[in-house]
Amino acid sequence: MTVKVKLKIILLSCLLLPLVLIAQDETSKKKALNIFTLGDSNGTFPQSWPKQLQTALPNATVFNISKSGRTIGFLNLGDSSLNSLFVIDENLKKAAEATKDRPFDYIVIDLGTNDGKAVFANRQGEVPQNLERLIQKIKSSPYPAVNNAKIIVISPTPYGTKAEATEKYKGGNKRVKKMSKAFKKVAKRTGCLFVNGYKTPGLNIETMTADGLHLDAEGSRLLIEPVLSLMVK
């Protein structure tokens, strides 16, 4: 084979590669994935990240159990139903009953924002421990449709200046920033996949939230881009 022919083959490969990747991406998006999402208020709105997952993966089934005010393991606002550790058994049962014999492919956890509130400032060492306990509860659940799913942990997005200007969330940005590092270690230790929500590419917490916390549609879409990459690769 001459050098000229080799160069033509290389050039043709370079031209065709983007088309192949596009075709693979479209095929991946057609996957009929079964996804269980667990989050806080950012998972409850019409433009929420679970909704964005459903839009991006139209053939997927997304079973969402998110709730405003939810924490990983703290009693928030005096409401025990907001403590994920306290209600995880009940929620896993709901998920298993909803999916029946069809196993979940992925469980996506996006929690921690409320664990970073000022009222919990002196208990931050408990947050990664609680996350690990939550993951272990999921992995050891009695429901085969749940306990064999791949788990994706998303660390919290930043706190914006509007949120930090309130007593309720004062100093929270530093706390959730630390969570991203701690959650990555927990994910690795427990065999989970990890997405650094604090460093979401393109996310501007000041312009993509009205209050420094709750993501608009654009922010929610950016948050799930790395999640999609893990699911469809």
Predicted features and spans:
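Short hydrophobic "helix-edge" motifs at membrane interfaces and signal-peptide entry regions
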Residues: 9, 30-31, 206-207
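Alpha-helical cap/lid subdomain in secreted, periplasmic
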Residues: 3, 25, 89-233
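Conserved SGNH/GDSL esterase-like catalytic core that processes O-acyl groups on lipids
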Residues: 28-37, 42-132
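Bacterial Sec-dependent N-terminal signal peptides
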Residues: 1-26
